[in-house]
């Protein structure tokens, strides 16, 4: 089964934005990004001006995909958490539900323990929203499948006849 595109309403987006905004403040992080596993940014909070969000989103998705490959090599389903420690800034990357990736950038003014604690709570809330979005998409897809297009029986030959080719 192929994955459906993630389509959400404004209300759901605002809920996601509120959760990551709260996470950014509560964890004393510089920036929080929510991206999907395809590398598309969904939402962000914090000082994002100095960061190339598009590159960050796609590289994070690639990092998660590569790490999934490593997990499978050693018999794990996945590694749900990645941590990269730098001289000034650190990256905490975690999987949210089946589709999301939460990226938290923090420095020495916060701690890994605080970030992990706050991410755990936010991840549960975000996963619930993703689940609702996927359930709605699944319901809409099954309703659409029952709809038969009036154009489904038109062939290229019929179009050529119509325009006199």
PLM-predicted stretches and their roles:
Residues 2-29, 38, 42-165:
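Acidic, low-complexity cytosolic segments
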């Amino acid at each position: 089964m192929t994955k459906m595109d993630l389509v959400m309403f404004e209300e759901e987006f605002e809920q996601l934005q509120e959760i990551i905004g709260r996470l950014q403040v509560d964890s004393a992080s510089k920036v929080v990004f929510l991206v999907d596993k395809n590398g598309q940014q969904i939402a962000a909070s914090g000082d994002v001006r100095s960061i190339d969000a598009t590159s960050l989103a796609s590289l994070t998705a690639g990092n998660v995909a590569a790490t999934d490959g490593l997990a499978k090599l050693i018999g794990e389903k996945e590694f749900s958490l990645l941590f990269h420690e730098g001289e000034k800034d650190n990256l905490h990357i975690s999987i949210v539900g089946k589709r999301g990736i939460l990226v938290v950038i923090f420095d020495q003014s916060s701690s890994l323990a605080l970030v992990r604690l706050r991410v755990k709570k936010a991840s549960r809330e975000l996963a619930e929203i993703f689940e609702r979005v996927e359930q709605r998409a699944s319901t809409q897809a099954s309703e659409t499948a029952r709809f038969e297009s009036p154009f489904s029986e038109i062939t290229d030959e019929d179009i050529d006849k119509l325009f006199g080719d």
